[in-house]
């Protein structure tokens, strides 16, 4: 059975053997439960199975590809024919999962944000090996005082350690995308800033970075009734811009926001 990549679903199948081998060598998945997101035609799936995982779950939205995967791998994998945005990852297994994902670029940031904001006190995964459009990956790993630094950088660094593994050229895919891709490794942090509601982190960073070229005075006054006092409490110069505040400062501001609201 042959299935053509669907542009509407952002499908680009990874075909580069060297890259495929590199991906499955990043973490030790032997005898572990693994989740693959967007397996497509099963190229990476084949390499994952060579590493002898205890169990391999795959989430594939495309009905045609789900049939292809069933024909190709039969009982070697557990196929979840659904949209990853609708899947509750914590219900897939009671074991921590090693996750691999060639995420559709049109929903990659939405997926990552969803996972980060829904992480409770216990992580449902022990590693995430995810592919992004290079431009998005650069935003995720960016440090403060950089023009790429923003909401994604802060959200990602809250509970996760993030590392770029490699950049991948368009010729490694079929069909070829028009842009470069990057592979990132995410692992859970042992210690992270405790917040009452993660959505407040999303809300406040959205307010600050929707005006990233403005000085901090305006977003401070939008978020806090006493913006100047809060800035003074944390020793923040309101003449700076949102990209000049490191992630820990934003976490403290969110906690202050939650404390003031009771």
Swiss-Prot record:
InterPro entries, A to Z: KsgA/Erm (IPR001737), rRNA_Ade_diMease-like_C (IPR023165), rRNA_Ade_Mease_Trfase_CS (IPR020596), rRNA_Ade_methylase_Trfase_N (IPR020598), rRNA_adenine_dimethylase (IPR011530), SAM-dependent_MTases_sf (IPR029063)
SUPFAM superfamilies attached here?
Answer: S-adenosyl-L-methionine-dependent methyltransferases
Kindly list the places in or outside the cell where this protein is found, as annotated in its UniProt entry. Cytoplasm
Family annotation (Pfam families): RrnaAD
Positions of S-adenosyl-L-methionine binding: 12, 14, 38, 60, 83, 102
Name the domain of life this protein comes from.
Bacteria
Sorted alphabetically, the keyword list is: Cytoplasm, Methyltransferase, RNA-binding, rRNA processing, S-adenosyl-L-methionine, Transferase
Q: Which SMART domains match?
A: rADc (SM00650)
The record's PROSITE patterns line, in alphabetical order, gives: RRNA_A_DIMETH (PS01131), SAM_RNA_A_N6_MT (PS51689)
Which EC class, in a word?
Answer: transferase
Main function = Specifically dimethylates two adjacent adenosines (A1518 and A1519) in the loop of a conserved hairpin near the 3'-end of 16S rRNA in the 30S particle. May play a critical role in biogenesis of 30S subunits.
Protein known as: Ribosomal RNA small subunit methyltransferase A
Q: Which organism is it from?
A: Pelagibacter ubique (strain HTCC1062)
